[in-house]
Amino acid sequence: MIQSESRLKVADNSGAREILTIKVLGGSGRKFANIGDVIVASVKQATPGGAVKKGDVVKAVIVRTKSGARRADGSYIKFDENAAVIIRDDKTPRGTRIFGPVARELREGNFMKIVSLAPEVL
């Protein structure tokens, strides 16, 4: 579960390396975000010459969490790190590549472009 002030790795080539969660979108007073949820975040580390710079406020969708997610069949999926992909307002990724596996729950959130770019969907 991701909450305010959580730091996440960025799993795309938008230029950001690490982001800090500012707010979880989707309802007033919402505290936690899971896989497939959209957050507002600030870029804390960035690579030179990238599309986003340090200090930029961006929207991102969570693609991997350490706490994991429960599936409808009763199984759980967990990852080794917390990671997100920076997106535009129309739910398309800012970068052109996705690094690492993403969870199948992104299909339900209509993030089909991220799912198609990902090397592996678990």
Curated annotation (Swiss-Prot):
Gene Ontology MF terms in the entry: large ribosomal subunit rRNA binding; structural constituent of ribosome
GO CC, alphabetical: cytosolic large ribosomal subunit
Tree of life domain: Bacteria
A matching Pfam family: Ribosomal_L14
PROSITE patterns: RIBOSOMAL_L14 (PS00049)
Parts forming coiled coils: none
Keyword check for RNA-binding: yes
Keyword Transport carried by entry: no
Family stated for the protein in its record: Belongs to the universal ribosomal protein uL14 family.
Function according to Swiss-Prot or TrEMBL: Binds to 23S rRNA. Forms part of two intersubunit bridges in the 70S ribosome.
Subunit structure, as described in the record: Part of the 50S ribosomal subunit. Forms a cluster with proteins L3 and L19. In the 70S ribosome, L14 and L19 interact and together make contacts with the 16S rRNA in bridges B5 and B8.
Protein name: Large ribosomal subunit protein uL14
